[in-house]
A protein has these predicted regions:
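Hydrophobic alpha-helical transmembrane segments
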Residues: 25-34, 104-112, 193-204, 396-412, ...
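C-terminal substrate/ligand-recognition segments
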Residues: 382-445, 476-500
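Membrane-interface interhelical loops and short amphipathic "cap" helices
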Residues: 1-19, 46-53, 77-99, 151-187, ...
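Internal alpha-helical transmembrane segments
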Residues: 113-122, 127-133, 144-153, 173, ...
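Hydrophobic alpha-helical membrane-insertion segments
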Residues: 62-70, 133-153, 229-240, 430-448
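Membrane-interface helix-loop-helix modules in multi-pass inner-membrane proteins
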Residues: 64-134, 151, 450-453
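Membrane-interfacial loop-to-helix junctions in multi-pass inner-membrane proteins
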Residues: 45-63, 89-95, 99, 119-137, ...
């Protein structure tokens, strides 16, 4: 077994931080809107029971929000400590949306969070309601700007490389912010957060019904959660369709890994279920699947909006396909090396004040810059992501998403029919789907990030070039420190939440409840 390098440990540390952080983010995104909806019902009806319900869910939101912020701050610092080359190469672009997020979105939600949490009976009902909606909007604005940054890494646009500084510089902020890849990534990510939040509300409400406690409040919460989840599941279906389309156009290797496509084909079928052959590689003729179910034409429709279109496979992207205008990977690597050498020659000519040579080398660099990152790959197969992990993560995400959609329909129907108590298996399934929701979301992020390997920035910078040159021991130590810290934070959140949940709706779930002085 190969020993892990410093870069591998840096990747593992960032993956650890991101996956832990994303345990908290989805609940913040969706639960904030669910709380706002519940409080709107309270303000419209004046029913104090809805106030009780709102304050209960607000207390759980506050716990999750605080710990989510802590893990997010650590992740931002890792860009500078573990990925200094990346920060230098694209900091001018990547930092802009993060700065806007801090100035606009985070301060919006932080300001109104205090009013939302501590302002009960201190400000008017309408102002408190406005504050709650501002927190929900601010939380989702934060997600937008962060996902704009991530979307740019997947599809870099709106910039120009400056050979004098060896940095990419922003040319169009709006092209970066309104990139179709960034927009589709934002919509799909917040959609998953909304579904997780709906499952969270449904699961806890189901627990109360199973225990025979707070039946009225639990049923009302169940209706809101299931309704919200059903609408968001439909939204998630369409945003996922758009996301897959964008991946096909901008990251064909990722799509090939997602669906286990080795040989490209016209009228390509979609595999909703399959077992990959572990012996299959690009260099042999083994079957791709040990078992699979295929829907004809579906992948061509999903990827190109045309049932007769061609979907390239891994072999096409590595060996090339002249008929489809796909360059062999080795040619892209060669062009990348030409671009890298042209940059070196440009700097040397600049040191010698040779303007003619500078112009020549700059021209060569610009002609080959789109393949710049490929010059750092040792061999064509380095451009292939981990196929099995990407494939199974994608299919787990889709399968669980389909399950959630059916659960929302069943739960909403049975609750509205006032029969939900009779279907205890459905209630237990609601409870079980809380962790399953997080598994689906984490699987989605694995698809997004593992599926684009080896790239830190698509086509421009591989991960091993983006990393800071750190001693392996230093990264190992920080990895285990973060692993222990994040695990402790997760355990603390779960423990505090369970304590709060056990208090029930009658505690009113205001700020005083967290201090042990809940209203009775």
């Amino acid at each position: 077994m190969n020993e892990l390098s410093s870069v591998d440990w840096s990747r593992a540390q960032f993956a650890l931080t991101a996956l832990y952080h994303f345990l908290f983010v989805p609940l913040t995104l969706g639960l904030s809107f669910i709380i706002a909806i519940m409080e709107t019902i309270y303000v419209k009806t004046g029913n104090e029971r809805w106030k009780k319900i709102t304050k209960f869910w607000l207390s759980l939101f506050a716990i999750n929000f605080a710990i989510g912020v802590a893990t997010g701050i650590i992740m931002e610092f890792e860009f500078g400590t573990n990925w200094a080359n990346y920060s230098w190469f694209v900091g001018d672009i990547f930092g802009a949306p993060l700065a806007v997020e801090g100035i606009m979105a985070f301060f919006l939600e932080a300001t109104f969070f205090a009013v939302m949490f501590f302002g009960w009976d201190k400000v008017s009902k309408k102002f408190h309601l406005i504050s709650t909606w501002c927190v929900a909007i601010g939380s989702n604005l934060s997600a937008f700007w962060i996902l704009v940054a991530n979307g740019w890494m997947q599809y870099p646009v709106g910039m120009q490389f400056n050979p004098d500084t060896a940095r990419n510089e922003m040319q169009s902020f709006f092209e970066v912010a309104l990139s179709p890849v960034a927009i589709s990534k934002f919509l799909h990510t917040i959609g998953s957060g909304y579904v997780i939040s709906a499952l969270f509300v449904m699961g806890i409400s189901a627990w109360f019904i199973l225990k025979g406690r707070h039946i009225i409040e639990a049923k009302k919460s169940l209706v809101v959660g299931a309704s919200f989840g059903l609408v968001c599941s439909v939204f998630l279906f369409f945003s996922g369709d758009e996301s897959a389309y964008r991946v096909t156009q901008t990251q064909p290797m990722k799509l090939a890994a997602m669906e286990g496509v080795y040989q490209g084909e016209h009228r390509a079928g979609l595999v909703p279920f399959g077992i990959l052959n572990p012996k299959k590689t690009i260099d042999n003729n083994e079957s791709v699947f040990l078992f699979d179910i295929t829907i004809p034409y579906a992948l061509s429709i999903l990827g190109n909006r045309d049932p007769n279109s061609f979907v390239p496979g891994i072999e096409d992207l590595i060996h090339g396909n002249e008929d489809r205008g796909i360059e062999p990977m080795q040619e892209r690597i060669d062009k990348g090396k030409i671009a890298i050498q042209a940059l070196k020659d440009y700097k040397l000519a600049k040191d010698n004040n040779d303007t003619a040579a500078m112009a020549t080398h700059k021209s060569i660099l610009e002609a080959n810059f789109k393949d710049f990152g490929y010059g750092y790959l040792e061999k064509p197969t380095d451009a292939i992501p981990p196929v099995a992990l990407t494939f199974y993560s994608f299919h787990i995400m889709v399968a669980l998403g389909s399950l959630f959609f059916l659960l929302f329909i069943a739960t909403l129907y049975l609750t509205m029919a006032n029969d939900i108590e009779k279907f205890r298996k459905i209630l237990w399934l609601c409870l079980l789907c809380i962790p399953l929701g997080y598994i689906a979301a984490e699987a989605g992020w694995i698809v997004a990030e593992v599926g684009r390997q080896p790239w830190a920035i698509q086509d421009l910078m591989p991960v091993h070039i983006a990393a800071t040159e750190l001693g392996k021991v230093n990264v190992q130590i920080s990895f285990w420190i973060f692993a222990v810290l994040f695990t402790a934070l997760l355990i603390a959140e779960i423990k505090i939440m369970l304590t709060q949940i056990k208090k029930g709706f009658d505690a009113y779930a205001g700020y005083s409840t967290l201090m042990g002085k809940g209203e009775k």
